[in-house]
Amino acid sequence: MASGSADHEDLRYRQCAGVMLANREGLVFAAQRIDSKNLGAWQMPQGGIDPGETQQEAAMRELEEETGVSADLADVIARMPYPVRYDLPEELQGKLWGGRYRGQEQHWFLARFTGTDADIDIAAHNPPEFSEWKWVEPDELPRLIVPFKREVYRAVVKEFRSLI
């Protein structure tokens, strides 16, 4: 599907929720996407909000699906007071989410991880979305994400930095 800028402008943003999971050492969880391994795309747990779900419920569901970390091991300590958006680059328009969205509007939560590394299982979801994971310094996150999501990650880090 070819998308002109007018078509792109008419599309909505997909509603999404994400979790910045911080450990006791002040590092945050990042995982490499299986479908973007050649791009080196790392990200935090995130995904679409299902009908009837609150933003926080969606964020915690995505956390468990993508990392195996249940809500009882992740204490939500903050919520970003405003959503952040990104637009898909032209080469991805029409390829993701059935071509129905121009990008995502993301609602972010900061959660303190109270478990151990053994509680993390990125193969918990079938099929898994991630090939590997690591703890990183918060300021390293924007460099790890695909370029079109960098401003979102900068905003999330800025918002939660003092609480990590």
From Swiss-Prot:
PROSITE patterns, per database record: NUDIX, NUDIX_BOX
- Signal peptide residues are none
- Per UniProt, the short sequence motif Nudix box occupies residue numbers 47-68
Its keywords, alphabetically, are:
Hydrolase
The UniProt entry, under InterPro entries, shows: Nudix_hydrolase (IPR020476), NUDIX_hydrolase-like_dom_sf (IPR015797), NUDIX_hydrolase_CS (IPR020084), NUDIX_hydrolase_dom (IPR000086), RppH (IPR022927)
**Gene Ontology biological-process entries:** nucleoside phosphate metabolic process; ribose phosphate metabolic process
The protein's role, per its UniProt record: Accelerates the degradation of transcripts by removing pyrophosphate from the 5'-end of triphosphorylated RNA, leading to a more labile monophosphorylated state that can stimulate subsequent ribonuclease cleavage.
Q: Which NCBIfam families match?
A: PRK00714.1-3, PRK00714.1-5
* Protein name (record): RNA pyrophosphohydrolase
